[in-house]
Amino acid sequence: MKVLLIKDVKSLGKAGEVKEVKDGYGQNFLIAKGFAKAATHEVLKQYEAEQKKKAENLRFELANLEKLKEELSKITICIAKPVGANGSLFGGITKDEIAHALKEQKNIEIDKKSLECDTIKELGMHEISIKLGHAIHAKFKLEVKGE
């Protein structure tokens, strides 16, 4: 019998592959445990339609991420913090503060965990990197001013 694997099965194949297996193994184990479906014409057609939809969604998501990357590369945000007598910041600027400033100043919401920087403790311009997903990274400028 032919089955369409829904999940990866050790020693048989990866999800999405069509495999020829013995009837008992296919019916009693693979299909019963939810690892596969019988590879009928309708099931294969439905699987192909789902794959096309996933590919289209991925293309749309990648296009949006590239657009966001382009938008972020043109942005400079400014954060003002109190400074000491020697010109150094009290405390520092955290990822949370950077994400909040990006939301407040440019209306771009990002997760603070996607920021790739340490706590900033110096005045001046800094380049901040963001992981957007799907191996796409963006950079924007952060200006730290003293109050």
Curated annotation (Swiss-Prot):
SUPFAM superfamilies: L9 N-domain-like, Ribosomal protein L9 C-domain. Disulfide bonds: none annotated. It comes from the Bacteria. One of its GO terms (molecular function) is structural constituent of ribosome. Keywords: Ribonucleoprotein, Ribosomal protein, RNA-binding, rRNA-binding. Pfam families: Ribosomal_L9_C, Ribosomal_L9_N. This is Large ribosomal subunit protein bL9. It comes from Campylobacter lari (strain RM2100 / D67 / ATCC BAA-1060).
